[in-house]
Amino acid sequence: MAPIKVGINGFGRIGRIVFRNAAQSCEVEVVAVNDPFIEPEYAAYMLKYDSTHGQFNGDIQTVEDGLVVNSRNVKFYNKRNPEEIPWAETGAEYIVESTGVFTTTEKAKAHLKGGAKKVIISAPSADAPMFVMGVNHKSYTTDLEVISNASCTTNCLAPLAKVINDEFTIIEGLMTTIHSYTATQKTVDGPSAKDWRGGRTAAQNIIPSSTGAAKAVGKVIPALNGKLTGMAMRVPTANVSVVDLTCRIEKSATYDEIKKAIKIAAGNELQGILSYTEDEIVSTDLIGNNHSSIFDAKAGISLNDNFVKLVAWYDNEWAYSRRVIDLISYIAGKDGSK
């Protein structure tokens, strides 16, 4: 069966990691990339060398109009506006919108003018339906033209929250993500008018920040709407983050019973999405881990049988990008494109 033809708009951090994940997949093929700020030679360099994930495992060459990656042609465009990108030239039907700019349905829909069939926003969206693999992906309907893969933190929290709510019913909860720094932060102190603390140097500080990830869980699990909220602590690590979910549960359960429920789910309906470990891991051990959520059984604690703190890790770059590929593969199957 022919692979699903994919285009990527925005060859930044997530765009490149999505490309790397696609290169490992037999179901999808990236046939076109658009980025107005870089040329093919520089794109090839950034794809080949990565300070966090190492060198690209494959062959990359540049040609006049793009790249040749593992003997496959990848057309490169430099258009600023989505409606100007001629996706139809390469047959790209599913577009990963990873600029971080066109995150509303109206803005992302502009890709359809160039021949795209569907758009997957690799960020939370104010109005596009959000899907988290393993949680609510089956609610996708083929009439949707623009969807969101939610955020990396929502992809970690939602599977864990789903298991706890399904088995024990969450009354309310608070989440903190201890999150590696990202491209929006500063290498040295600089101006950040809307978030003064966010303008401080990323490599020297623990920076309290806001996140909509916990509230977004209520959009993918309606039963939890209004029951979760959270915050972020941006920390001086380059990759891998960890979620701390502290919640009250209706059905009394010991910590061992909670661990057992998560372990069962990780080996069954959430296999490949949720992982369970009792190893003495630290963040760098999980660079390149494909799971959306890695439950750390030894890191959690409970105060009593109705109040518990749960800890789950995630590679906020790699695992999230892998879910983008998984989501494309799933919706293409529903659309009849594979």
Curated annotation (Swiss-Prot):
Its main location: cytoplasm. Pathway: Carbohydrate degradation; glycolysis; pyruvate from D-glyceraldehyde 3-phosphate: step 1/5. GO terms for molecular function: glyceraldehyde-3-phosphate dehydrogenase (NAD+) (phosphorylating) activity; NAD binding; NADP binding. One of its GO terms (cellular component) is cytosol. The keyword Oxidoreductase applies. The active site is at 152 (nucleophile). D-glyceraldehyde 3-phosphate binds at residues 151-153, 182, 211-212, 234. InterPro entries: GlycerAld/Erythrose_P_DH (IPR020831), GlycerAld_3-P_DH_AS (IPR020830), GlycerAld_3-P_DH_cat (IPR020829), GlycerAld_3-P_DH_NAD(P)-bd (IPR020828), Glyceraldehyde-3-P_DH_1 (IPR006424), NAD(P)-bd_dom_sf (IPR036291). Keywords: Cytoplasm, Glycolysis, NAD, Oxidoreductase. NAD(+) binds at residues 13-14, 35, 80, 316. GO terms for biological process: glucose metabolic process; glycolytic process. Pfam families: Gp_dh_C (PF02800), Gp_dh_N (PF00044). Homotetramer. This is Glyceraldehyde-3-phosphate dehydrogenase. It comes from Blumeria hordei (Barley powdery mildew). The gene is GPD.
